[in-house]
């Protein structure tokens, strides 16, 4: 008996040693993959930085090209910061966190190249191909490895609340009794900080009013004050923007995490500008409001770009913020209104207006209970609601529109029959978009979807529709592309839900914003 026990113990020990060896090898492989990705990004950043320095003193290079190089530096700087965080703390991230951040790094890379092409400038092929290849391999590694890495990286699930919260994620603001307040108190942070905030009874860190009755007259002044707080600032900073039209170009950079903006309501608090591509911006740079700081929340604000349809690409809002959320906001523009650039995003009870590709980008974005208003384009144009930009089969990005409504904007209603309108078209090779239980107006063409150029991406894209309603929801005459799918059951639709697509049940509840975790 004792011999048997010893043999059994030996087998058990050998088994656990083998498991430990696999885990160690896995950790080493992960670190190697992330280090290679960071090295490639740093090399690209250095290369484009050198080019920017050279062009800054050149009398030949145009200012638009210099602008494109400057944006590339910024994008690679953001990517380097994310990859450095992953290298140091990769064991504290879930698999989906890592895949999301790698997907965001790849989106930054492609955005840099797209911007240079837009300015009719080339790029260094070696830099391009090296970064693309390394990030593709890193994404493939995590997609293939997530089975055996799942337990170690995800840890035990919290009962009924999804995965445990990794250290990098936005945390609950820490304003305990030790911090003295003057005036109204902050809302109950455990009861829905964003939803419960009230301008008459809740406290903001900064207040913006055009008439000078608050701490600042402009949003940019308030954000500058946030920057000056440095490391001493609160976990979440609340900025209340009173009713008014704020003609500003705003950029919330990667250092400004956990910013919460609250306005006085759609079409009452308005942030506006008119930058556009024909006048010299890149699509990325044309945004009236751009945000790269993670954990960004906004409520009761309109973001708009007034450049008009004749100015083509003109972004109202660009979002490159992980775990970002927009509640009761409006986004107004024509072409390229809402740039869901990268990372995980949630939109609830929002209004989106536009004509061509007006919800686009390479984020993992979910829209719930939103109203999508198709506007009148120029006479020779058609309308495409979405243009999702997934360019690698291993990224976890896409657009999911759920429990929403597609309608003609008031000025378009009477003439909508004169124009072709579609649910979307494939901006990139692996474009991925689904409409789930959404009410679709008859303005949508029976084909549903439109080609980008010939047969490009028709076999590699993923477009899906599930249980939609309305006169434009019939799938009998939809396109017969290999990549188009009529989803037959909830099991096919569930990968695109809040819970699974953006892991929202682990980070949305603290806001208090209502959401459906499933189909």
UniProtKB/Swiss-Prot annotation:
Residues that bind substrate: 283, 313, 425, 427
User: Region (Pectinesterase 36): which ranges?
Assistant: 205-505
Q: What is its main location?
A: secreted
Q: Which organism is it from?
A: Arabidopsis thaliana (Mouse-ear cress)
Q: Which family does it belong to?
A: In the N-terminal section; belongs to the PMEI family.
Q: Which SMART domains does this chain map to?
A: PMEI (SM00856)
Q: What is its EC number?
A: 3.1.1.11
This molecule's function is given as: Acts in the modification of cell walls via demethylesterification of cell wall pectin.
Name under which the protein is recorded: Probable pectinesterase/pectinesterase inhibitor 36
């Amino acid at each position: 008996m004792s011999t048997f026990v010893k043999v059994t113990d030996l087998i058990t020990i050998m088994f656990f040693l083998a498991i430990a060896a696999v885990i160690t090898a896995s950790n080493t492989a992960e670190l190697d993959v992330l280090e290679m990705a960071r090295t490639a990004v740093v090399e690209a950043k250095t290369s484009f930085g050198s080019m920017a320095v050279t062009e800054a003193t050149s009398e030949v290079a145009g200012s638009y090209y210099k602008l494109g190089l400057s944006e590339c530096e910024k994008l690679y700087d953001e990517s380097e910061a994310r990859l450095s965080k992953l290298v140091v703390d990769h064991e504290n991230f879930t698999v989906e966190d890592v895949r999301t951040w790698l997907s965001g790094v790849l989106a930054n890379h492609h955005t840099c190249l797209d911007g240079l092409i837009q300015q009719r400038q080339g790029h260094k092929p070696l830099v391009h191909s090296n970064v693309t290849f390394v990030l593709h391999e890193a994404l493939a590694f995590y997609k293939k490895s997530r089975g055996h890495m799942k337990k170690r990286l995800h840890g035990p699930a919290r009962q009924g609340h999804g995965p445990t919260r990794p250290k990098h994620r936005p945390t609950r603001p820490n304003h305990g009794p030790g911090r003295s307040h003057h005036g109204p108190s902050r809302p109950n942070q455990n009861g829905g900080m964003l939803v419960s905030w009230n301008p008459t009874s809740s406290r903001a860190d900064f207040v913006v009013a055009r008439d000078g009755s608050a701490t600042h007259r402009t949003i940019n002044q308030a954000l500058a004050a946030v920057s000056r707080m440095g490391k001493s600032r609160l976990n979440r900073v609340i900025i209340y923007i009173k009713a008014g039209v704020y003609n500003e170009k705003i950029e919330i950079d990667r250092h400004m995490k956990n910013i919460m903006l609250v306005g006085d309501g759609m079409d009452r608090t308005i942030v506006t500008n008119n930058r556009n591509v024909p006048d010299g911006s890149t699509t990325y740079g044309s945004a009236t409001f751009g945000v790269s700081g993670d954990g960004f929340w906004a409520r009761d604000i309109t973001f708009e770009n007034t450049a008009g349809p004749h100015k083509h690409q003109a972004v109202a809002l660009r979002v490159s913020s992980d775990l970002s959320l927009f509640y009761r906001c409006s986004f107004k523009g024509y072409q390229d209104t809402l740039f869901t650039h990268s990372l995980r995003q949630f939109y609830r009870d929002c209004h989106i207006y536009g004509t061509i590709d007006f919800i686009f980008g390479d984020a993992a974005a979910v829209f719930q209970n939103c109203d999508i208003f198709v506007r009148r384009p120029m006479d020779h144009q058609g309308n495409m609601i979405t243009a999702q930009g997934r360019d690698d089969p291993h990224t976890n990005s896409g657009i999911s529109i759920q429990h929403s409504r597609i309608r003609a904007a008031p000025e378009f209603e009477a003439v909508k029959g004169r124009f072709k309108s579609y649910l979307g078209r494939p901006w990139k090779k692996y474009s991925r978009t689904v409409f789930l239980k959404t009410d679709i107006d008859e303005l949508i063409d029976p084909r549903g979807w439109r080609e980008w150029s010939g047969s490009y991406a028709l076999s590699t894209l993923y477009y899906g529709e599930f249980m939609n309603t309305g006169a434009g929801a019939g799938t009998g005459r939809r396109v017969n592309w290999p990549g188009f799918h009529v989803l037959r059951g909830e099991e096919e639709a569930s990968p695109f839900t809040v819970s699974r697509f953006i892991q929202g049940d682990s980070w949305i509840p603290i806001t208090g914003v209502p959401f459906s975790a499933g189909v």
